[in-house]
Amino acid sequence: STAVIIQTDSGGTGNGDIFVNSAVTWAANKLTLSAYGNININADLNATSTASLALNYGLGAPALDNTSQITTTNAAANLAGTASYTTTQGSDGVEKAYTVITTLDQLQGMSSNVAANYVLGSNIDAAATSTWNLSTGFAPILGFAGTFDGLGHTISDLFMSKGATGSIGLIGSTGVGSVIRNVGLVGGSVSGGASTGALVGSNATGTVYNSY
C-alpha cells in the first residue's frame, strides 16, 4: 500500500468533520486523516506491521482554545506494537508523537515518563494486577501531564487496593494540560480514600472525555 491522505476543508455544507464509517486495514506506509473539524471513528482502523496513522484535526482554527476532538464510537484504532501514531490539533499546532501500548507492563511503565504521550494499540487484560505489589495491585500513575488516548480500547479487570490517603486510580492524578480520552475500564476493583476513581483519582487541571 502507498501513503494515503484524506482531507476536509471549509467548503460545502458540512462542518469539515471526517467520519470513518467503514473498516480500513493497511500494513505499511501512513494513513493521514486531516480534518477541518473533528475526527469521528465509527469503524475499526487496523494498522498492522509497520503501518502508521496520523490524525490531524481542528485545522480550521489555531491551536489555542481549539475545541475540536478525536472520538471513537463502538470502534477502535488497532495499532501494532511496531506501528506509529501522531496527532496535530489546530492550524498552527505542534505534532505529538505517541508511544504505542499493547501490554500490561507497558501500561504500568507510563509512570516512568508522565510528560509523554501514550496510545492503546489494543485492549489490555489487567487481571494479573491482583497479585502485584504484595496484592495491592497496579501502582497509580501520578502527575500525568501528557495525552493518553485509548482510541476505543478497554482495560479489563484492573485491581487496586490502597490505603485511605493519596490519589488512587489508573491515572492517580493529572498535571496541567493532560488529556485522557477514548478509553474504557471494564470489570476489576479499585479502592482507596477520598481521591479515588477507577480511571482518574484526582483531576484538577486535566481534560477527560469519551471515557468510562
Label each residue range with its predicted role.
Residues 1-212:
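Surface-exposed repetitive/solenoidal architectures
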